[in-house]
Regions:
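Negatively charged
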Residues: 1-236
């Protein structure tokens, strides 16, 4: 291939590293110099409050806790290539300033998004384009993400098994997710606790759910008909 170091993806936004690129390599696209980084370099740069908008993350597979407790970070990282990342657990956990466009991220390799936006109290961006079909863990993903109220109805959550606390204390969230395939979910503990959520869930297949403890605790508005739910496997309500 004629790839030099980095290139612009066909989506017109993501900057990717060429297949033979190594950490530290640089390349220029549209007059901007981009640097290929590995996980260790990236974490050090974050610790040093470095500019991250021109970093190429194709070599990174683990972004767990990347911005955890980083109260000031709010840089544009829309060009990041996350197509090789498998875990984003706690990635923006308590990153209270972050609110940037990340809708074009290719998250199709990610399996764990639990606690990803936990207490990310400013985040409220469109992420409906995300391919989450390989994600198995979304526990507490938006817990205490008090601003988040976006349409994520098109998400393919058919691989998810743990949604415990997913929207717990997501105090703005009230979106239609009736079309979600939750047939593989076993844990829904506290899923809509302390939220204003009041949407139709009557068609959800919850037949594999075992844990439903505190699912709607302190949700004072939910009044939907869920009498058709098959809760025969539930051991904790």
């Amino acid at each position: 291939d004629n790839c030099d170091t980095v290139y612009l993806d066909t989506n017109g936004l993501t900057i990717k590293a060429c297949s033979d690129a190594t950490a530290g390599d640089t390349g220029v696209i549209d007059g901007v110099t981009y640097t290929v980084v590995d996980e260790a370099m990236l974490r050090t740069m974050i610790d040093n409050d470095s500019i991250l908008t021109n970093k190429v993350t194709s070599l990174v597979t683990d972004m767990s806790d990347l911005f955890k407790d980083n109260s000031t970070f709010n840089q544009n990282i829309s060009t990041w290539d996350v197509s090789n990342v498998t875990t984003m657990i706690g990635m923006f956990n308590n990153a209270i300033s972050f609110n940037q466009v990340i809708d074009f991220w290719d998250v199709s390799s990610v399996t764990d998004m639990s606690f990803m936006f936990y207490s990310a109290t400013n985040f409220n961006q469109f992420i409906d384009l995300w391919d989450v079909s390989n994600v198995t863990e979304t526990a507490a993903m938006f817990e205490y993400a008090t601003a988040f109220n976006q349409d994520i109805s098109s998400w393919d959550v058919s691989s998810v098994t743990d949604m415990g606390g997913m929207f717990n204390n997501t105090t703005a969230f009230n979106q239609d997710i009736s079309s979600w395939d939750v047939s593989n979910v076993t844990n829904m503990n506290g899923m809509f606790a302390d939220t204003p959520f009041n949407q139709d869930l009557s068609t959800w297949d919850v037949s594999n759910v075992i844990e439903m403890g505190s699912m709607f605790t302190n949700n004072t508005v939910f009044n939907q008909d869920i009498s058709s739910w098959d809760v025969s496997n539930v051991t904790n309500m």
